[in-house]
Swiss-Prot record:
SUPFAM superfamilies (alphabetical): Sigma3 and sigma4 domains of RNA polymerase sigma factors
Lineage: superkingdom: Bacteria
Name the record gives this protein: Uncharacterized protein YqaQ
Family, per entry: To B.subtilis pcf and to sigma factors.
Length: 151
């Protein structure tokens, strides 16, 4: 991914989260918390039987075309939301983290600069710094290209 794609991904995070919740309600009847997307459990919780939040193979085969399309879109957005969430851990510097979080909320450069009490140009420079950091780390490529692994 190039710098502009990463920036667009971060800026579109706030509406993608809303769309993930909406699609989960349509497909599953309820919202699945993001912290439960593939997190291992320990102790008694690990031994207790629990239903799968996803669809079984039989259910996937019986889905109509609309549900299939919604399911694919849900998985697409979940991957991107998860990648943006994990990207916050890769950023160094408190102001960089605040700018990243504000961008995730959909705030403009002007709103971020007013919030932090710095100029828009400084916000832009700091944003360029942490996006360069994410590009060099190849963070998003690794998370979003899991399907292209070596056989």
């Amino acid at each position: 991914m190039n710098r502009k794609e990463i920036e667009n991904l971060i800026n579109s995070y706030h509406w993608m989260v809303k769309e993930v919740r909406r699609l989960q309600r349509v497909l599953y009847g309820s919202v699945i918390p993001m912290k439960n997307w593939g997190v291992a459990q320990y102790g008694l919780e690990a031994t207790m039987p629990k239903g799968s939040p996803g669809k079984s193979q039989a259910e996937l085969r019986q889905m109509d075309m609309r549900e299939e399309r919604l399911f694919k879109r849900l998985k697409y957005y979940e991957e991107r939301v998860y990648a943006v969430e994990l990207g916050a851990e890769k950023i160094h510097g408190e102001q960089h983290k605040v700018i990243y979080d504000c961008m995730m909320e959909g705030m403009s450069y002007r709103a971020i600069s007013l919030h932090l009490g710095i100029s828009r140009e400084t916000v832009r420079k700091m944003k360029d710094e942490f996006i360069s950091q994410l590009c060099q780390d190849c963070h998003f490529e690794r998370l979003l290209n899991l399907k292209k692994s070596v056989v």
